[in-house]
Amino acid sequence: MAAKEVKFQADARERMLRGVDVLANAVKVTLGPKGRNVVIDKSFGAPRITKDGVSVAKEIELEDKFENMGAQMLREVASKTNDLAGDGTTTATVLAQAIVREGAKAIASGMNPMDLKRGIDLAVDAVVKELKSNARKISQNSEIAQVGTISANGDTEIGRYLAEAMEKVGNEGVITVEEAKTSDTELEVVEGMQFDRGYLSPYFVTNQDKMRVELEDPYILIHEKKLSNLQSILPVLEAVVQSGKPLLIIAEDVEGEALATLVVNKLRGGLKVAAVKAPGFGDRRKAMLEDIAILTGGTVVSEDLGIMLENVTLEMLGRAKKVSIEKENTTIIDGAGSKTEIEGRTAQIRAQIEETTSDYDREKLQERLAKLAGGVAVIRVGGSTEVEVKEKKDRVDDALHATRAAVEEGILPGGGIALLRAVNALDGLKTANDDQRVGIEIVRRAIEAPVRQIAENAGAEGSIIVGKLREKVEFSYGWNAQTNEYGDLYTMGVIDPVKVVRTALQDAASVAGLLVTTEAMIAEKPKKESTPALPAGGGMDF
């Protein structure tokens, strides 16, 4: 085992704080409508230009192991916020840096780290409660467009496309973002269904870059039991090979010899095939397979219906224009099922929703209805260069997550104002001791950080902006960094989803609390490279 280096207390915190600062300083310049760009060098191709906080955070790796630990823990804040809310990563990073900095100062002056953390947690809970109580439900399409625009760094075109996509497929529909082949950004809405099962073997992948299986105009075999060998479906497999079309197999499971044979056939190029597990469990699985059959115009191969695998013909297989399978989900686009049958099925599901008394069953039925009736919207992002397209696609992804979050939990005034106003919730908090009170004050100062940073990125003085905002008490009164105007942010369209603001604060406080209470750090000692001995004669030629 290699020798380890151990750092304690102030020394450990100082090194960690240096790492936190490096990562946070690189990420926070992207915050707000006037956020700056960060250029990331790539080992191949052109450098990447981005304003996406989590993309910047993922690129940072420091040489000093102790500093790197601090940076990586802060990176975790950005990643976690991105996973939960899909946006707000830069805000979370700015908040975490502010809490860690203030916390380190308090500990250096002799405060108890555990009490500080308790105070921080108390304050965060109070602020989150205040944010939720001031949330405004989203009702109009224009508000969805505003959320999308803000999250896409002020790009109104992206906001408009997202609002249009959500209007067409509903809040439950599936929206995907792709790179366009032209310089124009466009929206395409396709009838389709997505379920949370991915390919059974990575050998089925056809698009190696995106690790995705793409089948054009495939046949779809829908089977409710396991497939262990292919003997029983050889006749239908041969018929599919003759037709020259790809085949998707949806079954309870495809295992052993059956899976191995399919993989070998795919690799040899004999049959373009992919297999996925059927979605759901028990009776719900049967219902979902029936949904897929109706959508694709196929038949579920089920012993309950008296259909044996040996008797399956091409006519019993479903058809679709395209099937896209990723590691964890499958999308069937433009199924060949008849419109009247699909409408009949959706009416049947709606009736079941009306009748059911179980919240869980209702939720699952609504999911099925959305998959049958919702469809898939594809936003194709265009640009003049590959670099521009990638940067824009990052912003569209952020904006998509933000709009979903806004519909889910409602909206708040944007520009960091909601956090600044929520500071009132900290006034009446009772604490067990003075150290916990300091923890609350740390959060009070930290939640000003996003407004200050947005102002600095826009070329304004943060403390002047904060001072002016404090003069007014209206919750939605704030400063619009894009236009440099003060007023009601709802009216100006500067809004943030509650989920994004809440998640950013909670994740920042969670990781900052861990950093503040760290007393020791252990890392492997760097190996000293020994200089090779010079050859006799010092390399000179006599």
Curated annotation (Swiss-Prot):
SUPFAM superfamilies: GroEL apical domain-like (SSF52029), GroEL equatorial domain-like (SSF48592), GroEL-intermediate domain like (SSF54849). Its EC number is 5.6.1.7. The keyword Iron does not apply. Keywords: ATP-binding, Chaperone, Cytoplasm, Isomerase, Nucleotide-binding. PROSITE patterns: CHAPERONINS_CPN60 (PS00296). Disulfide bonds: none annotated. The keyword Ribonucleoprotein does not apply. ATP binds at residues 30-33, 51, 87-91, 415, 496. It catalyses: ATP + H2O + a folded polypeptide = ADP + phosphate + an unfolded polypeptide. Its main location: cytoplasm. GO terms for molecular function: ATP binding; ATP-dependent protein folding chaperone; isomerase activity; unfolded protein binding. It is found in: Cytoplasm. One of its GO terms (biological process) is protein refolding. One of its GO terms (cellular component) is cytoplasm. Belongs to the chaperonin (HSP60) family. Forms a cylinder of 14 subunits composed of two heptameric rings stacked back-to-back. Interacts with the co-chaperonin GroES. Together with its co-chaperonin GroES, plays an essential role in assisting protein folding. The GroEL-GroES system forms a nano-cage that allows encapsulation of the non-native substrate proteins and provides a physical environment optimized to promote and accelerate protein folding. This is Chaperonin GroEL 3. The lineage of its organism: Bacteria, Pseudomonadati, Pseudomonadota, Alphaproteobacteria, Hyphomicrobiales.
